[in-house]
């Protein structure tokens, strides 16, 4: 209460920020008359003037009023749109590295042009991040007209572009693209072998459109580049037969007494955490079945070391069969299991679940099982976007997640007031006892809207529910259009016309996000279709366009009279923000509109979190069948349940980040080392450091620290140096001839001998000739061990929670063991690189060049590379055949088959392998 009183007196933090920004808006508005008098060339020349002033040391903040005024004037001339004052407020918020919450229809795309232009003046590049390729291309073409007019270059970063096309896109002043593609380019840039193969030029400033979708909804799933691992097809098929033979344990036991279990069984399901667990009886049943199938020997248990992988397969099969359902979590298309995005209901073609889950679902559905993937490179969106020097974002719904944006990304949320106050009527939820009653009420509402001509947008949380509504509307003979993951290619066109008279549109969650629903229809989309119609001549096109403009204007007035766009939702999403996004489709720019949620006690959110409380209310009121409860207390109860889920999901994302921060620190070290190696003209300091460490470790195996001569194994050290390292050192003679010698002096002699042997090799071949070979050996060793390290971290992460049973803190244990694993990685690289460079036998510089090319070729020619990422559109790239065609996509480890000594050399020289590159091994 005290905080409310203080807010009324002093204003909120948001109010104070906006008050400061409005003073700057007054300065911008004061420049408008002055800039209107400039001709196009004079206005365009302002860009170079600003760039010169920035180069001379003037800050962007000082330039802001003039730069924003130039963009506004350019937009008036080119786009025929003038930035509203509230858009200026949003632009300032974005420039200051904050999140701007602007309601649907307030012109976020145009708002972004202000800070984008201002920050592009530095010449360091600005990235505008969107949720899908359609929006990236649309916005780049649309706003590109304005940027080009002002003398700025614009690039579009899309999947399947060549290296040269991507480099051109990134070298532009402003680059549009998706979060996935920006992230994958970063990973690929840290997998290349040549400096010229990188495409990005640094991460300066990013503006993330639909920032809540990218930084919140998709933050639990990292970007992963993976390649196929060992094939376990037969094992998946066999284990899939085990699950139907197991039974579920029904009921719930009292943890204190153990009483209350009505039906013993083999496994339990926790719907809240989306997990399945074997009971003690389940372990015994599974072991018996696996023994009968011949998969484990008699008397063996699932916890035997030899059966660890079997346990992995069994749990994957349990999850795939019991927790993941067709047409809800995935669909089967053309013999493939395609994941459905839980946030948008769209297909995520090319994305695959990890840990064998996808293969388990494929076995369940009887489709072809594809091999498991090994992670080659990975990063979370949290850690990728925190690499930018400055980050900001915009969305229609950020305030409910303001704490998470601040906590995880350090981003403050600024709520920008609308240009016109919304007239949308958000009606109370109606809760029914059963799903059937809920759908009957929703269909009745839809029919009433249709009969009076009011357009309706029906929101669902899954494809399955959208198809139920679809069938019910067909049964009622109500014409409608369906917008879900199965038709996402047409979604922008469908959404654009969802505001026309008598239009009924069914949409999964926020399908079509980024496209406005204009009352009476989007005339621009209709005009595009007319202009693309080759059967019409110019006169006919002009006549049709005039007719459409008149028709849409008339329909707009009619729809407003009827109450605007009606939103009908058939389920609450677990996030209030997603519900608000659906509501936000209606009432744009001061238009009328209304929304209503129809719920039942059988809905997942209600059943798990709020059902008992609402059910008791309905029973006390003795409500008859078909009657709904409609009260503020019910809506508040549901929102309370949503807050619980949001808090749990936040904890999950925060925990993921805490674990990923460990690998992120290591990733930074590895990537920095790779970049240093590629950028260095002389690698001898790095090689010398590795060699010194390697031979110190080797020597200490035979001559321990602070030991006496009697403890030394000099003969063993001499033999190892000679046999494994090709170094002849008469160490025993030197020790015998010396009056006294310490272990440190022995180490110095070994190091000196190693350095001399390497120096001889360099002198014979030439330092310049050896550098590229050293570079490739270093990079390949780092890459291969980094991939193994990622797999080791994955396995460590999966089982680390068990440390809690030993009274240890899992997170601290993970950090400790991950650090130890990283130390092992560095040791492995040190030893492998040193051994390769010390023992390689080379006769000429030409041989070295061929060897370097062969090593690099092995890293570039792998196929079956898979890109995994969460996305709204399902445009996740799965590259198999194209991997060898795209230079920046290719580095994924060795795919060269083993070559026989008498086989032709893979380098293409025509010589036998033993007479060509075989000499080097």
Swiss-Prot record:
GO molecular function: ATP binding; metal ion binding; protein-exporting ATPase activity
Subcellular location: Cell inner membrane; Cytoplasm
Cofactor or coenzyme needed: Zn(2+)
One Gene Ontology term from the biological process aspect of the record: protein import
GO cellular component: cell envelope Sec protein transport complex; cytosol; plasma membrane
Matching SUPFAM superfamilies: Helical scaffold and wing domains of SecA, P-loop containing nucleoside triphosphate hydrolases, Pre-protein crosslinking domain of SecA
Coiled-coil portions: none
Keyword Transcription listed: no
Cofactor annotation comment: May bind 1 zinc ion per subunit.
Pfam families: P-loop_SecA (PF21090), SEC-C (PF02810), SecA_DEAD (PF07517), SecA_PP_bind (PF01043), SecA_SW (PF07516)
Chief localization: membrane
Binding positions for ATP per the UniProt entry: 87, 105-109, 516
EC numbers, comma separated: 7.4.2.8
Taxonomy, superkingdom: Bacteria
Subunit: Monomer and homodimer. Part of the essential Sec protein translocation apparatus which comprises SecA, SecYEG and auxiliary proteins SecDF-YajC and YidC.
Physiological role: Part of the Sec protein translocase complex. Interacts with the SecYEG preprotein conducting channel. Has a central role in coupling the hydrolysis of ATP to the transfer of proteins into and across the cell membrane, serving both as a receptor for the preprotein-SecB complex and as an ATP-driven molecular motor driving the stepwise translocation of polypeptide chains across the membrane.
HAMAP family linked: SecA
Name this protein carries in UniProt: Protein translocase subunit SecA
Species name: Polaromonas naphthalenivorans (strain CJ2)
């Amino acid at each position: 209460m005290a905080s409310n009183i203080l807010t009324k007196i002093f204003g909120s933090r948001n109010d104070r920020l906006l008050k400061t920004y409005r003073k700057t808006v007054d300065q911008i508005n004061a420049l408008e008359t002055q800039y209107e008098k400039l001709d196009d060339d004079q206005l365009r020349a302002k860009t170079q003037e600003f760039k010169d002033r920035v180069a001379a040391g003037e800050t962007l903040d000082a330039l802001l009023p003039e730069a924003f005024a130039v963009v506004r004037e350019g937009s008036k001339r080119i786009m025929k749109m003038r930035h509203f004052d509230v858009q200026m407020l949003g632009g300032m918020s974005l420039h200051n590295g904050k999140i701007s919450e602007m309601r649907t229809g307030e012109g976020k795309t145009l708002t972004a042009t202000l800070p984008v232009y201002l920050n592009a003046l530095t010449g360091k590049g600005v990235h505008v991040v969107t949720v899908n390729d359609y929006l990236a291309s649309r916005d780049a073409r649309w706003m590109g007209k304005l940027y080009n007019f002002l003398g700025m270059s614009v690039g579009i970063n899309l999947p399947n572009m060549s290296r040269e096309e991507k480099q051109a896109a990134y070298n532009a002043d402003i680059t549009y693209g998706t979060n996935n593609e920006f992230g994958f380019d970063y990973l690929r840039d840290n997998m290349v072998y040549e400096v010229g193969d990188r495409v990005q030029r640094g991460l300066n400033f990013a503006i993330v459109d639909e920032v809540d979708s990218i930084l919140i909804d998709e933050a639990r799933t990292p970007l992963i580049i993976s390649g196929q691992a060992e094939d376990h097809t037969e094992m998946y098929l066999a284990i899939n037969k085990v699950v139907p033979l197991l039974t579920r344990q029904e009921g719930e036991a009292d943890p204190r007494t153990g009483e209350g279990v009505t039906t013993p069984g083999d496994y339990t399901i926790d719907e809240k955490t989306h997990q399945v667990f074997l009971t003690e009886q389940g372990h015994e049943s599974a072991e018996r079945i696996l023994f009968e199938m011949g998969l484990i020997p008699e008397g063996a248990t699932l916890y035997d070391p030899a059966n660890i992988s079997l346990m992995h397969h069994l749990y994957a099969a349990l999850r795939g069969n019991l927790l993941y359902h067709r047409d809800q979590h995935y669909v089967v298309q053309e013999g493939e299991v395609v994941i459905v995005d839980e946030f948008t209901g769209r297909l995520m073609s090319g994305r695959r679940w990890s840990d064998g889950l996808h293969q388990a679902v494929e076995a369940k559905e009887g489709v072809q099982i594809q091999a498991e993937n090994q992670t080659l490179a990975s990063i979370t969106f949290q850690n990728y976007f925190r690499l930018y020097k400055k980050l900001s974002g915009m969305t229609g719904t950020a305030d409910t997640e303001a704490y998470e944006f601040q906590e995880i990304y350090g981003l403050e949320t600024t709520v920008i007031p609308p240009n016109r106050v919304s007239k949308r009527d958000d009606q109370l939820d109606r809760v029914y006892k059963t799903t059937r009653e809920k759908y009957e009420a929703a269909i009745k509402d839809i029919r009433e809207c249709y009969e009076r001509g009011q357009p309706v947008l029906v929101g669902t949380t899954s494809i399955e529910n959208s198809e139920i509504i679809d069938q019910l509307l067909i049964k009622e003979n109500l014409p409608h259009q369906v917008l879900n993951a199965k038709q996402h290619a047409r979604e922008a066109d469908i959404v654009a016309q969802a505001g026309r008279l008598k239009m009924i549109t069914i949409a999964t969650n926020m399908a079509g996000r980024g496209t406005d629903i204009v009352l009476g229809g989007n005339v621009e989309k209709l005009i595009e279709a007319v202009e693309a119609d080759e059967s019409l001549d110019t006169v006919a096109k002009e006549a049709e366009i005039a007719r459409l403009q008149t028709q849409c204007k008339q329909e707009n007035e009619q729809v407003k009279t009827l109450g605007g766009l009606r939103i009908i939702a058939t389920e609450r999403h677990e996030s209030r923000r997603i519900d608000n996004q659906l509501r936000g489709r209606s009432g744009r720019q001061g238009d009328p509109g209304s929304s209503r949620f129809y719920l039942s006690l059988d809905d997942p959110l209600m059943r798990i979190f709020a059902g008992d409380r609402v059910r008791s209310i309905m029973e006390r009121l003795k409500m008859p069948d078909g009657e709904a409860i409609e009260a503020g207390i019910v809506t508040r109860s549901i929102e309370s349940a949503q807050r619980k889920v949001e808090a749990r999901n936040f904890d999950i994302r925060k925990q993921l980040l805490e674990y990923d921060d460990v690998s992120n620190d290591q990733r930074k070290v590895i990537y920095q080392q790779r970049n240093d190696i590629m950028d260095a003209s002389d690698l001898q300091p790095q090689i010398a450091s590795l060699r010194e460490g390697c031979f110190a470790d080797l020597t200490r195996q035979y001559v321990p620290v602070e030991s006496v001569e009697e403890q030394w194994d000099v003969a063993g050290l001499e033999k190892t140096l000679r046999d494994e390292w090709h170094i002849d050192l008469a160490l025993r003679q030197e020790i015998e001839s010396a009056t006294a010698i310490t272990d440190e002096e022995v180490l110095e002699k070994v190091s000196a001998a190693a350095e001399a042997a390497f120096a001889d090799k360099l002198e014979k071949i030439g330092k310049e000739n050896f550098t590229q070979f050293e570079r490739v050996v270093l990079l390949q060793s780092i890459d291969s061990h980094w991939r193994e390290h990622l797999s080791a971290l994955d396995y460590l992460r999966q089982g680390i929670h068990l440390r809690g049973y030993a009274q240890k803190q899992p997170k601290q244990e993970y950090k400790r063991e991950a650090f130890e694993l990283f130390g092992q990685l560095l040791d492995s690289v040190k030893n492998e690189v040193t051994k390769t460079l010390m023992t390689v036998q080379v006769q000429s510089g030409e041989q070295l060049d061929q060897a370097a090319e062969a090593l690099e070729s092995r890293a570039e020619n792998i196929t079956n590379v898979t890109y995994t990422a969460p996305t709204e559109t399902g445009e996740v790239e799965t590259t198999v055949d194209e991997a060898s065609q795209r230079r920046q996509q290719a580095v994924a480890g060795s795919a060269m088959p083993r070559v026989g000594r008498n086989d032709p050399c893979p380098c293409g020289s025509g010589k036998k392998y033993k007479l060509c590159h075989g000499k080097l091994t």
